[in-house]
């Protein structure tokens, strides 16, 4: 319970205390997007690592040497908890955005940080918007930003171990032109 409180408190404090940095990043985003990307990515990776530390999470990555570091990758995985995002973001190379449910875009500050790290918001009830989001994701991949998606569309509800298979966690390399 103490770790849970530490995690929630850390995330909340980060969102509040990072407002000045967020405002600066939003101001420089148009003129210096590469600086904005690098700083945003570094700050989010840092806070995710802090949260993982406070939660007592130990990470073991197998096969990371198989992931290309010189181009964008589409990551596909099973969604077990919000920690999937923290673990993935802190372990994959380069810039990586996530496909997230639209409801998260309604949370002030969180939405801004998610946009800065190239997250895409999906309205699961609107097929037309879903197609537009897929096209936006393709553009992100072409521009060099990896994308992570959890195709189930929500976190797994059972405690049973997920079956290993093609969708358990994989990556797809797309050619860039």
Positions of the model-derived regions?
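Catalytic core of membrane glycerolipid acyltransferases/transacylases, capturing the structured
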Residues: 22-42, 53-54, 69-127
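Charged helix-capping and loop-helix junction motifs
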Residues: 133, 162-168
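Glycine-rich helix-loop-beta junction characteristic of Rossmann-like nucleotide cofactor-binding loops
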Residues: 65-67
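Short gly/ser/thr-rich secondary-structure transition/capping motifs
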Residues: 54-62, 129-131
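Residue-level preference for the first positions of well-ordered beta-strands
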Residues: 72-74, 146-150
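A hydrophobic membrane-anchoring feature enriched in long, contiguous, low-charge segments
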Residues: 2-27
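Conserved small/polar residues in nucleotide/adenosyl-binding loops
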Residues: 170-176
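Short, solvent-exposed loop/turn segments at secondary-structure junctions
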Residues: 156-159
